[in-house]
Amino acid sequence: MIGIREIRSKMKSINNTKKITKAMEMVSISKLRKIKKRMCSSRPYFNIINQVISHVITGNLEHYHTYFNQRNVKRIGVIIVSTDRGLCGNLNTLLFKKVLEVLTEHINEHILNNLFVIGTKALTFFKSFTNNIVFSLSNLKNDFKIIDLMEMIRISLEMYISGKIDKLFLAYNKFNSTIIQTPTLVQLLPILKPKLGKKEVKKTWDYIYESNSKVLLNVVLNRYIEFQIYQSILENLVCEQASRMLAMKQATDNSADLLKALQMNYNKVRQSSITQELTEIISGAAAVSLN
């Protein structure tokens, strides 16, 4: 049977781990609040620019932009948004699984791929899968700016315009709630025409462009792509902190359960030890009295 000293050592070790996981849980809660507030504050702009693009696509365009061209697909590009650190459950695993399904499907159709990875975890994982990593971006801070993403966005758009990629996808974790995060893969380019209902069709209109409509359209569409990527990274950061908070809470709860079980075991061993000592003392006293 395990001794009292070993049980005490285990309890001390688990208690130290519990303190660490509890501290990490509290840190994640604090970070989650800050990033979630930032994500929510940017959503109105995100929703409005989506509405603008929907109306632009359904309207009668004076200039048909390259971003709307449907091509024969020979090569795709995928922007993958992951985390830099672990301890966030299966957040990255589920996303990578979804991306691999899409990549495998295209490879089976002899379609090549180019990857743009954000986060150390995606870079480490997809390095073992393909050599076609065009651009990688790691160690983004929680207070990152859209300018930090511009080089990657510029390269991906230039590759699409020049015909080096025919479709551009964006893979990230979508935040639904603190408990539910959904691995999501959306097509960025070519921009798809939205499916509108009867009520929405009646609300569509054409824009009147002042000055050069071609230049204005190009600026709006580029801003739309930029903000899609920016918002996806914000959502992924929120998902990361929510997943880490839940993972650390689970670890803390498991530590408490282990400590409870060890405490009971400790009490039993100690009780057995005391009983044995008392028995030995009584037996010794009885032997002395007989002599």
Curated annotation (Swiss-Prot):
Assembly notes: F-type ATPases have 2 components, CF(1) - the catalytic core - and CF(0) - the membrane proton channel. CF(1) has five subunits: alpha(3), beta(3), gamma(1), delta(1), epsilon(1). CF(0) has three main subunits: a, b and c.
Principal subcellular localization: membrane
Compartments where found: Cell membrane
Keyword DNA repair: no
Single GO cellular component term: plasma membrane
PROSITE patterns listed in its UniProt record: ATPASE_GAMMA (PS00153)
GO terms classed as biological process: proton motive force-driven plasma membrane ATP synthesis
Role, per record: Produces ATP from ADP in the presence of a proton gradient across the membrane. The gamma chain is believed to be important in regulating ATPase activity and the flow of protons through the CF(0) complex.
Native source species: Buchnera aphidicola subsp. Baizongia pistaciae (strain Bp)
Signal peptide segment: none
Tree of life domain: Bacteria
HAMAP family: ATP_synth_gamma_bact
Membrane topology: Peripheral membrane protein
Family of the protein in this entry: Belongs to the ATPase gamma chain family.
Protein name according to UniProt: ATP synthase gamma chain
Pfam family, one: ATP-synt
Sorted UniProt keywords: ATP synthesis, Cell membrane, CF(1), Hydrogen ion transport, Ion transport, Membrane, Transport
GO molecular function, a single term: proton-transporting ATP synthase activity, rotational mechanism
